[in-house]
A protein has these predicted regions:
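Intrinsically disordered, Lys/Arg-rich N-terminal extensions and targeting peptides
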Residues: 1-48, 175-196
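Sparse, context-dependent recognition of short Cys/His-centered cofactor- or disulfide-binding micro-motifs
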Residues: 9-13, 24, 38, 59, ...
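Generic ordered-secondary-structure signal
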Residues: 11, 36, 44, 67-68, ...
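Generic structural hydrophobic/aromatic packing signal, biased to beta-strands
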Residues: 26-28, 74, 84, 121, ...
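Positively charged, low-complexity, intrinsically disordered RNA-binding extensions
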Residues: 112-196
Length: 196
């Protein structure tokens, strides 16, 4: 009995030395880190110097087009320093850019908001393979993941794409999106009238 108690005490001593502070996981627009909400309070809770962090982040993302959302991971050290890891933009961002749309479909399985070719998928996979979580995955696995993401966004993956037909499709899609926005606005107004 006493041996097991002494083992537990020794394990507790080792466990006390491990730092289990939470990582900050958030998306920050490239070159637009500011001390205001929502980023400032998140950094303040973890005792990070907000001004130094914003300056560091904006310097690291100076070569990227401003406003692109970048998934960021921040690990805080006990001495208030931090380790900053900036990933590539999300897959959905790349897919929407390749498809030429600003937003995904409201009903992804039933509705198609855009189209991309397999070549687009391959090029995006090459970019995403530089991300730390995907470094050890094969390009085939990343392409499969991107095709699944495209499906959830309402983007169809095709072998070839005709430019004229796709332009007509996008024009038609633009009118559909306008109708959807009007419908949503009407629902919001009706809800406001009910609650007022």
């Amino acid at each position: 009995m006493s041996k097991s108690v002494s083992r537990l005490k020794s394990m507790k001593k080792v466990a006390d030395k491990i730092d289990h502070s939470s990582k900050l996981r958030t998306d920050i627009p490239a070159g637009m880190a500011a001390a205001g909400p929502p980023l400032g309070p998140m950094l303040g809770q973890r005792n990070i110097n907000i001004a130094a962090f914003c300056k560091d982040f904006n310097e690291r993302t100076a070569n990227i087009k401003p406003g692109i959302p970048l998934p960021t991971r921040v690990k805080v050290n006990p001495d208030r320093s931090y380790q900053l890891v900036i990933h590539q933009p999300p897959s959905s961002f790349f897919l929407k850019q390749a498809a030429g749309v600003t937003r995904g479909a409201m009903e992804p399985i039933r509705e198609i908001c855009g189209k991309v070719t397999l070549k687009h998928i391959y090029e995006i996979a090459k970019i995403k393979s530089q991300d730390p979580p995907l470094e050890w995955k094969s390009l085939k696995d990343i392409c499969t993941m991107l095709i699944a993401t495209a499906r959830t966004c309402g983007i169809e993956v095709v072998k070839e794409l005709n430019a004229k037909e796709y332009e007509e499709f996008l024009q038609h899609r633009k009118s559909v999106v306008e109708e959807q926005k009007k419908l949503l606005q009407e629902k919001r107004e009706a809800k406001m009238l009910r609650t007022a």
